[in-house]
Curated annotation (Swiss-Prot):
Family of the protein in this entry: Belongs to the bacterial ribosomal protein bL17 family.
NCBIfam families: L17 (TIGR00059)
Gene Ontology MF terms in the entry: structural constituent of ribosome
Spans annotated as Disordered: 118-138
GO biological process: one example: translation
Gene label: rplQ
CC terms in the record's Gene Ontology section: cytosolic large ribosomal subunit
Matching InterPro entries: Ribosomal_bL17, Ribosomal_bL17_CS, Ribosomal_bL17_sf
Source species of the chain: Rhodopseudomonas palustris (strain HaA2)
Protein's recorded name: Large ribosomal subunit protein bL17
Amino acid sequence: MRHGKVHRKLNRTAEHRKAMFANMCAALIKHEQIVTTLPKAKELRPIVEKLVTLGKKGGLDKRRQAISEMRDLDQVRKLFDVLAKRYADRQGGYTRIIKAGFRYGDNAPMAVIEFVDRDEDAKGKDSGPSQDGAAEAA
């Protein structure tokens, strides 16, 4: 019986879900806006909200909790240094989900999940191959 089980399985094992949401948290913190399916966005939202709350509380123990959840030290640093200061006066509601139509291949409902008051310049930052590597190879 599924009494009290509120989270979606998303057709994945527990380890796969945990790894997927850790990667999605890191991507959202890095780019401050990502496009994903609507069910994944709805499951990601409370995880990210709790991470931002950890960042606002600060302290070494909270930082270690965030590292164990996300496993990306650069994004944990950004969470505690940048996002914690940005949302210091806001009591929850750090993210928004915007429905973005349906995916062409399988008609899956898509959504954009982003931080409220996000930094517009963070989108696409450090994505793909570096331009330095392409110049050195030539």
